[in-house]
């Protein structure tokens, strides 16, 4: 589909067999910009927050296309602006989207590239809507089936309305999954550089998340 955008988001999609059902894979692309008052490094690069998340969305879109298969539901790949200012892009989308009631699931990425626990370099927090326990089952099964090198902290959340753009969708009662590797000393600092990312873990998270997205797009029920 043609890439479309506004001041609040950029998105593209792969049409599905069911024109009235959608899933969304998203991450925010904004960060903090430049601070001229700083003495040394003034650029907030945002490697983890949230170039890491954007990279996952792009690779999942690429993987969907590589299958050559049409998904059951239309898959929208979205890049939100204004997350750092209060989830502005995703809020705008859910408030203005004419088919929001037909969105069956949302997969979010925000900060998936660091090691909050240096002694556990494969650690990742896996948030998901508690009313959909199968989301936890999916990841457990895929880690075992494909020997994915991840150690998830499974966090089922009754109403996952905090933290990131997942909140905008949860407030619309849309089930969510959110990958996150927790905070670190470079959070919202100019020192959030690419040389501090755990690239191997990002790859494993992206593999696991593609399988999540595939299930969201193709499972009849969850």
Regions from the language model: what does each represent?
Residues 1-5, 9-10:
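Single conserved hydrophobic/aromatic residue that forms the stacking wall/gate
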Residues 59-69, 95-99, 140, 144-148, ...:
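Sec-exported extracytoplasmic/periplasmic mature domains
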Residues 31-37, 114-119, 185-189:
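Short acidic/His/Gly/Ser-rich catalytic and metal-binding motifs that mark active-site loops
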Residues 11-78, 95-98:
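Catalytic-core environment of secreted peptidases
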Residues 44-55, 69, 84-88, 129-134, ...:
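Soluble non-cytosolic domains of exported or imported proteins
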Residues 38-50, 66, 79, 121-130, ...:
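Second-shell loop/turn segments in exported
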Residues 80-182:
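Metal-dependent peptidase/peptidase-like ectodomains
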Residues 62, 66, 183-222:
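His/Asp/Glu-rich mid-to-C-terminal helical/loop segments that flank catalytic regions of hydrolases
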């Amino acid at each position: 589909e043609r890439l479309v955008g506004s001041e609040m988001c950029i998105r593209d999609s792969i049409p599905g067999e069911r024109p009235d059902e959608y899933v969304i894979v998203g991450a925010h692309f904004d960060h903090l910009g430049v601070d001229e008052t700083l003495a040394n490094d003034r650029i907030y690069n945002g490697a983890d927050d949230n170039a890491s998340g954007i990279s996952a969305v792009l690779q999942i879109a690429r993987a969907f296309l590589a299958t050559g298969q049409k998904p059951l539901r239309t898959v929208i790949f979205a890049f939100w602006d204004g997350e750092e200012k209060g989830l502005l892009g995703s809020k705008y989308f859910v408030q203005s989207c004419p088919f929001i009631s037909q969105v069956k699931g949302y997969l979010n990425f925000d900060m998936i590239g660091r090691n909050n626990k240096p002694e556990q370099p494969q650690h990742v927090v896996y948030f998901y809507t508690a009313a959909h326990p199968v989301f936890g089952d999916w990841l457990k099964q895929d880690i075992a089936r494909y020997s994915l090198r991840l150690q998830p902290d499974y966090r089922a959340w009754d109403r996952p309305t905090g933290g990131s753009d997942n909140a905008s969708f949860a407030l619309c009662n849309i089930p969510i999954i959110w990958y996150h590797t927790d905070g670190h000393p470079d959070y919202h600092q100019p020192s959030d550089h690419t040389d501090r990312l755990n690239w191997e873990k990002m790859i494993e998270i992206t593999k696991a998340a593609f399988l999540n997205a595939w299930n969201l797009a193709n499972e009849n029920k969850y």
